[in-house]
């Protein structure tokens, strides 16, 4: 089952960190070579095989302890082959740690379950696994002097460090700070709620489900069919608004942001709710991915084998930002959505961008392989076809007519309404959204017209 991200090709090992508890063996190929996939990887491939009815019954219990609070507990059990050809495999794991870098804590769980049934020449199996996790982060690709100017100087960096923060050590992380989420109760008393908050956090959960049929037609002919689905949900947080508010020690001044947000009425938008000058947003990357794999292998002799297969995939990735933490405010402002009816955004509402990436992928391969123990050679013929579509829900819609197209012409625009008294003095104002209107051949079109299409 392929696990490389369908949009960028990356592999996120944290999505199945506890799989070692039920791993039977790992097949590793370095560089281009004979491999039963539609598009052989130039860099190489890795295939992880889990335990099943063909393996011995047994279990493992493992406790790992490491530096910086690293702790991991793992359990795994494989039943082997039971009566009537049944078998099952179970695994679970929990990990946590503080991290070498300040406030880069981590916590994660892993679960795995597989049930198998031998039915004649078939082995049927269903499996499910996932690893919900979250961890603190810091920005990367920064020079050493960002953390420790003395250490950078010892390595030969002759840059001007006069504007740098005082030496904090290479474990320094500027993205966290102390925060007291105080509130006033009905009696006017201050209720304190103190915490340490890392503004850069990552959280994700990508469960995967598969249904497999391994069919041994005879001792020379083998067919495998797999259906699978994967559902990913999660994202990473960061600051929005005033992103350059650091104190003398280099930490982000969260308390100052919270205090300002807690008393920030903007009459243009609300008379009784506080507007956020700084808040946390989360960049979300959800996806739904399903596919099917069918491969066959025929052994002509001890030296010659033929294999081939089909690989079909459908992937939909949903990408957007949302308001994650208002830091004492009631709402934030965002004007990125060209179709919105209000710039006011509450907790959990989308900001910044919102688009879908849809990938349809198909591939096929055939391979002849020769090996006599001294010389090995293979001939591989493969091909694939992919289609990508991007849908942007924040861009204004196109007006598509029979004789012309107006690009990104229909959505909403901001209007400011001013209020004056009888003497002409300005006494108030408020922001509103109005629908864009395009007139064509005497007909008015808006974003709700049938002819309005997403970009």
PLM features: what roles do these ranges have?
Residues 2-30, 49, 154:
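Short acidic/polar hinge/loop motifs at secondary-structure boundaries
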Residues 63-69, 79-81, 94-98, 119-121, ...:
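Transmembrane beta-strands of outer-membrane beta-barrel pores
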Residues 64-72, 95-118, 138, 175-214, ...:
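Outer-membrane beta-barrel proteins
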Residues 124-210, 237-281, 338-345, 421-424:
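Acidic/polar loop-and-plug regions of large Gram-negative outer-membrane beta-barrel proteins
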Residues 193-238, 276-307, 318-319, 348-382, ...:
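Outer-membrane beta-barrel transmembrane strands
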Residues 307-455:
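Signature of Gram-negative outer-membrane beta-barrel scaffolds
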């Amino acid at each position: 089952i392929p696990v490389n991200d369908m949009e960028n090709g990356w592999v996120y090992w944290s999505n199945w960190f506890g799989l070692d508890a039920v791993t039977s063996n790992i097949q590793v190929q370095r560089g281009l070579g004979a491999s039963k996939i539609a598009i052989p990887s130039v860099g190489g491939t890795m295939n992880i095989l889990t335990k099943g009815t063909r393996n011995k019954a047994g279990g493992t219990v493992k406790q790992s302890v490491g530096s910086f609070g690293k702790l991991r507990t793992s359990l795994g059990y494989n039943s082997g082959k039971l009566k009537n050809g049944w078998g099952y495999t179970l695994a679970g794991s929990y990990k946590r740690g503080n991290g070498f870098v300040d406030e880069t804590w981590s916590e994660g769980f892993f679960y795995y379950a597989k049930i198998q049934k031998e039915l004649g020449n078939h082995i049927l199996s269903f499996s499910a696994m996932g690893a919900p996790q979250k961890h603190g982060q810091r920005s990367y690709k920064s020079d050493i002097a960002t953390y420790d100017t003395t250490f950078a100087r010892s390595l030969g960096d002759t840059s001007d460090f006069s504007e740098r923060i005082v030496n904090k050590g290479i474990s320094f992380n500027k993205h966290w700070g102390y925060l007291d989420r105080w509130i006033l109760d009905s009696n006017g008393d201050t209720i304190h709620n103190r915490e340490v908050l890392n503004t850069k956090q990552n959280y994700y959960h990508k469960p995967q489900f598969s249904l497999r049929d391994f069919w041994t037609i005879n001792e020379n002919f083998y067919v495998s069919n797999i259906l699978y689905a994967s559902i990913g949900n999660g994202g990473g947080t960061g600051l929005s608004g005033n992103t350059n508010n650091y104190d003398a020690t280099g930490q982000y001044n969260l308390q100052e942001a919270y205090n300002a947000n807690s008393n920030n009425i903007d009459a243009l938008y609300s008379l009784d709710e506080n507007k956020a000058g700084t808040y946390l947003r989360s960049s979300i990357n959800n996806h739904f991915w399903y596919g099917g794999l069918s491969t066959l292998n025929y052994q002509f002799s001890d030296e010659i084998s033929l294999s081939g297969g089909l690989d079909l995939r459908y992937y939909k990735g949903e990408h957007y930002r949302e308001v994650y933490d208002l830091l004492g405010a009631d709402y934030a402002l965002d004007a990125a959505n060209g179709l919105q009816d209000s710039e006011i955004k509450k907790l959990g509402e989308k900001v910044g961008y919102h688009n879908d990436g849809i990938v349809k992928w198909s591939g096929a391969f055939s391979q002849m392989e020769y090996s006599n123990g001294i010389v090995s050679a293979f001939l591989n013929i493969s091909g694939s076809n992919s289609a990508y579509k991007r849908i942007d829900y924040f861009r204004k819609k196109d007006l598509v007519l029979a004789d012309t197209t107006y690009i990104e012409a229909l959505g909403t625009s901001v209007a400011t309404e001013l209020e004056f008294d009888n003497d002409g003095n300005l006494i108030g104002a408020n922001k509103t959204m109005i629908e864009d209107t395009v007139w064509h051949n005497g007909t008015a079109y808006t974003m709700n017209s049938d002819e309005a299409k997403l970009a």
